[in-house]
């Protein structure tokens, strides 16, 4: 077992009851284009087209053969684009239940599948996009191979769903999915990472390796798992997938149908009844959260409060890789002498307010409690960074754009979520996730 001691479990109010409920009825879903790093779409549909579940919507020009399929049947009502015609979202009004079917197999056949059979079904169904690479966090090329494949079956993000609760209901589909993924690269390790005290279903596979992690966040991040088990570099790539997509893989291969359901956490200080809800990928979050939130100005986030995406306008949908929806209040009000008050109701990792010594949960808002300033190395980053890197030096190189120095200090192992805690504790209010992405893009472009 690997124990993570450095990190932070955010004491935020609104933790979800770990019981699955049905979510609000919705009639709109979307695929968010900007979730896919470096993707340039070649559209196969236009506004007004009627599509079936599993039908191709667009293909990646930069990654030929990688297709993106509809999570539900209905009518294309909008194709939203931003600056430089960047694809923001493809919106579908859900109608009917027509679907495209794919190859299916009996449970006994799964362990005899060839790598090509697995790859073909994943690509044709669009489930290939559930896989991501490290480094760079991109959908892998269909011609590439990985050093190993990671399945993340734990989640230590604030307000997250407990994977064991979800997997209890889908244990057979999950083990079927593991069997299928083990056939993708039969000679390469399949790493299943789980919490040490969790009851995660497993199966006896030749290349399956099970790893237990325990401790504070980010113990549940795949970047942490990769760092300790099979570190990557410029010449070495691993792939990873989350546990709910493994369920979808299992269902695809045994039913021949694309499975787009999600069980997500709907939680946060502004949610009236924080709980787990059953919905679908790409769901309209305004519809999902209708009558669920406390009065006032709220920020709905697709993903974790630490590193999720703001859900509004053309991005008002559940992300492809998001397993939670977090809601906090907009904190734009000014406080009289806020800088000098004892602040018993505020939390601080640097012990600058009385709230640090309290054991209660806090109603966090979007307020940053200060403006941008110079980076101040006071040891905050080291307290929340469990990886074997020098965070202050790495973050400095990221800020100034020193790609050589950043590579030497381990930036290729990281994704935006791995630096979310550094952003949270940063006295200078830097958003290190977006800075990291700029540096990674530059490294990939320049080689």
UniProtKB/Swiss-Prot annotation:
Reactions this protein catalyses: a ubiquinone + n Na(+)(in) + NADH + H(+) = a ubiquinol + n Na(+)(out) + NAD(+)
Disulfide pairings: none
The keyword Heme is annotated on this UniProt entry: no
Highest taxon in the source lineage: Bacteria
Keyword tags: Ion transport, NAD, Sodium, Sodium transport, Translocase, Transport, Ubiquinone
UniProt keyword Mitochondrion present: no
EC number: 7.2.1.1
Biological processes per GO annotation: sodium ion transport
GO molecular function: oxidoreductase activity, acting on NAD(P)H, quinone or similar compound as acceptor
A Pfam family this chain is assigned to: NQRA_2nd
Enzyme class per UniProt: translocase
UniProt record similarity statement: Belongs to the NqrA family.
Subunit structure, interactors included: Composed of six subunits; NqrA, NqrB, NqrC, NqrD, NqrE and NqrF.
Its job: NQR complex catalyzes the reduction of ubiquinone-1 to ubiquinol by two successive reactions, coupled with the transport of Na(+) ions from the cytoplasm to the periplasm. NqrA to NqrE are probably involved in the second step, the conversion of ubisemiquinone to ubiquinol.
Name the UniProt record assigns to this protein: Na(+)-translocating NADH-quinone reductase subunit A
Annotated organism of origin: Haemophilus influenzae (strain PittEE)
């Amino acid at each position: 077992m690997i124990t993570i001691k450095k990190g932070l479990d955010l004491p935020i109010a609104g933790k979800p009851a770990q019981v699955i409920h049905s979510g609000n009825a919705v009639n709109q879903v979307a695929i968010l284009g900007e979730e896919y790093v470096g993707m340039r779409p070649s559209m196969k549909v236009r506004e007004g087209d009627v599509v079936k579940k599993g039908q191709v919507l667009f293909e990646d020009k930069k990654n030929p053969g990688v297709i993106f399929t509809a999570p539900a049947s209905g009518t294309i009502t909008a194709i939203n684009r931003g600056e430089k015609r960047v694809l923001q979202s493809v919106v579908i009004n859900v109608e009917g239940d027509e679907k495209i079917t794919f190859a299916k197999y009996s449970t006994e056949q799964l362990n005899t599948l060839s790598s090509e059979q697995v790859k073909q079904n994943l690509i044709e169904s669009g489930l290939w996009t559930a896989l991501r690479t490290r480094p760079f966090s991109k959908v892998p090329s269909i011609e590439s191979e990985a050093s190993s494949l990671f399945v993340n079956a734990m989640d230590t993000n604030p307000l997250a769903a407990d994977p064991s609760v979800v997997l209890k209901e889908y244990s057979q589909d999950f083990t079927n999915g593991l069997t299928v993924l083990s056939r993708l690269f039969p000679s390469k390790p399949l790493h299943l990472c789980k919490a040490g005290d969790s009851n995660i279903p497993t199966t006896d596979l030749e290349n399956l390796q099970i790893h237990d992690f325990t401790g504070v966040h980010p113990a549940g991040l795949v970047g942490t798992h990769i760092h300790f088990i099979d570190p990557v570099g410029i010449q070495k790539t691993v792939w990873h997938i989350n546990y709910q997509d493994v369920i979808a893989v299992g269902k695809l291969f045994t039913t021949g149908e694309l499975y787009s359901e999600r069980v997500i956490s709907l939680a946060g200080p502004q949610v009236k009844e924080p709980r787990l809800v059953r919905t679908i990928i790409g769901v309209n979050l305004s519809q999902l959260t209708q009558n669920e939130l406390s009065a006032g100005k709220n920020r709905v986030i697709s993903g974790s409060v630490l590193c999720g995406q703001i859900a509004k306008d053309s991005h008002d949908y559940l992300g492809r890789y998001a397993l939670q929806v977090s809601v906090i209040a907009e904190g734009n009000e000014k406080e009289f002498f806020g800088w000098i008050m004892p602040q018993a109701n505020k939390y601080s990792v640097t012990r600058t307010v009385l709230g640090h010594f309290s054991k209660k949960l806090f109603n966090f808002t979007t307020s940053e409690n200060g403006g941008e300033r110079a980076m101040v190395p006071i040891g905050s980053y080291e307290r929340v960074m469990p990886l074997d890197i020098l965070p202050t030096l790495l973050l400095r190189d990221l800020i100034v754009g020193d790609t050589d120095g950043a590579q030497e200090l381990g930036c290729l192992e990281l994704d935006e979520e791995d630096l979310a805690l550094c952003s949270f504790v940063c006295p200078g209010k830097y958003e290190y996730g977006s800075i990291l992405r700029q540096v990674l893009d530059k490294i990939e472009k320049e080689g």
